[in-house]
Amino acid sequence: MKSIPGDIPQYLLIKAQLQERIQSGALKSGDKLPSERELCAIFNTTRITIRESLAQLESSGLIWRADRRGWFVTPERLWLDPTQNTNFHKLCREQGREPKTALLSGVLTTVPVEVMESLQLQPFDQIYLLTRLRYADGRAVCYCENHCLPARVPELLQYDLNGSLTEVYESHYNLVYTSMHLSFYPTAMPAQAAQALGVMEGRPALLLRRLNYDQHGRVLDLDIEYWRHDSLRIEVDTH
């Protein structure tokens, strides 16, 4: 890394130049950056310096890395209003994005201790545990664990769960999400979520924990979601 005592390090100067290109619109959402080798030639520097610059931009949420494909300008964040009861697929479509949900696993298992109280269950009660990956415009943005109650949705695993769980509940069980308790806070990406999303374990993430109720006021399920730190923003209008 080239720098002169008292001067700004070269990796920060390169970061600033790339950031200016992104914020000015010269590089647009979804655009692919030149390869690391090409950037080395453009800025007449080493690959180590370029990687430091790219890491800084990634931490700022301006670019993201696709495995074996390179670096891309980060798409605009999805925005979520917690006061609006909407599902992921509807949220994406309302914002001009193409949603996709992929079921990674679905099992009947003993309720995890950390969600037992929220679901009003006893030790060794059973739940359906779904792990799913959510995409916006082909980019994996959210790793989700759905904890579903067999008493509300018996034989859930027989249905196609590669889509909206809301629609499955409505069409097969006549159950509708009507209210929820939502908490969200920054956290470190756990190993299983990191592997599914293609990011490093321990990277910044936004955790959403959503306890959902049906039209009869009963607990319906509990979702735990790990979002890429650069993919979601929370907005609330109190007017």
From Swiss-Prot:
CDD domains: WHTH_GntR. InterPro entries: Bact_HTH_transcr_reg (IPR050679), Chorismate_lyase_/UTRA_dom_sf (IPR028978), Tscrpt_reg_HTH_GntR (IPR000524), Tscrpt_reg_PhnR (IPR017722), UTRA (IPR011663), WH-like_DNA-bd_sf (IPR036388), WH_DNA-bd_sf (IPR036390). One of its GO terms (biological process) is negative regulation of DNA-templated transcription. It holds the Pfam family GntR. Residues 8-76 form the HTH gntR-type domain. One of its GO terms (molecular function) is DNA binding. NCBIfam families: phnR. This is Putative transcriptional regulator of 2-aminoethylphosphonate degradation operons. It comes from Salmonella choleraesuis (strain SC-B67). The gene is phnR.
